[in-house]
Each structure stands twice: as C-alpha cells, then as structure tokens.
C-alpha cells in the first residue's frame, strides 16, 4: 500500500508519514498519515484524500469495504520506520510489541535512536534494543512544557 500511495502524497508536496489498515470485521479503515514542515490543515487532508481515492478506485487494492481517513500524525504521532525512530530520538515513546521481548510486551521510556535493525529505548535506567520487526505499535508521548 505504501508503494501505491506514497508517490501520490509526495507528488502533492506532503510526506507520507505512514499507512495503517485496520480490519474491523466487514468494514475496515485505511488511515493515511501525512505531514509537512508547515503543519497539516483540514484542507490538506481533503486534497490528499481526493487524490488517493482516485488511485484506490482505479487500482482497487482492497477487496472489502473500507473507509479512507487522511490525517496528520498529531502530537502523539505513530512511528513506522527506522528513519522515523532516528528522527524522533530524544522523545518519550510508548511501544507495544507483537510478542514478548525479555519478558514484556510494553515499553515506555526515552527513545535513544536505532542500532542496526533495533530501536533503542531507555526504560527505568535499563536500555533495551527492540527488534523493529517485533514492534506492533509505537507512539510519541506528547510533552506539554
């Protein structure tokens, strides 16, 4: 899906931050996160949504019913790629794994960065190297300074 939709988003001048497909029974949700240095407004989401809808109608990559949602990643932005983990080093994060790692699935702490294919997070003075392929969901924890 990334290969199909990212070029459309980027051609409009936005960054395709990530794509989620959430299967919810008979009706699913396709969520596309877009970003821009100047921020994202509702008009930006509408513009991208119209273009993506056209591509999805032609290519028809999803056989079931779904809703398309285009939005900003927001303050609690999800992290999808190693590059994003590198860019967000120094932020507080919440990470959920697909399966336990060192006896746990949930980690909340300081994102240190990336080493090889591992995300480095400091939790209670212990540094964990979490394999990227084990990460189910990761989000920035917003700061309100």
UniProtKB/Swiss-Prot annotation:
It is found in: Cytoplasm. Belongs to the RimP family. Its main location: cytoplasm. HAMAP family: RimP (MF_01077). GO terms for biological process: ribosomal small subunit assembly; translation. GO terms for cellular component: cytosol. Required for maturation of 30S ribosomal subunits. This is Ribosome maturation factor RimP. Keywords: Cytoplasm, Ribosome biogenesis. InterPro entries: Ribosome_maturation_RimP, RimP_C, RimP_C_sf, RimP_N, RimP_N_sf. PANTHER family: RIBOSOME MATURATION FACTOR RIMP. NCBIfam families: PRK00092.1-1 (NF000927).
């Amino acid at each position: 899906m990334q290969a199909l939709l990212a070029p459309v988003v980027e051609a409009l001048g936005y960054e395709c931050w990530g794509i989620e497909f959430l299967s919810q029974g008979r009706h699913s949700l396709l969520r596309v996160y877009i970003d821009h240095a100047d921020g994202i407004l509702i008009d930006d989401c509408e513009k991208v949504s119209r273009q993506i809808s056209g591509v999805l109608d032609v290519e028809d990559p999803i056989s079931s019913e779904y809703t398309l949602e285009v939005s900003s990643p927001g303050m609690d932005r999800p992290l999808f790629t190693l590059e994003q983990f590198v860019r967000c080093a120094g932020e507080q994060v919440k990470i959920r794994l697909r399966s336990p790692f060192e006896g746990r699935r949930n980690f909340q702490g300081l994102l240190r960065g990336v080493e090889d294919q591992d995300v480095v997070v400091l939790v209670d003075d212990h540094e964990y190297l979490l394999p990227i392929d084990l990460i189910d969901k990761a989000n920035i924890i917003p700061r309100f300074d």
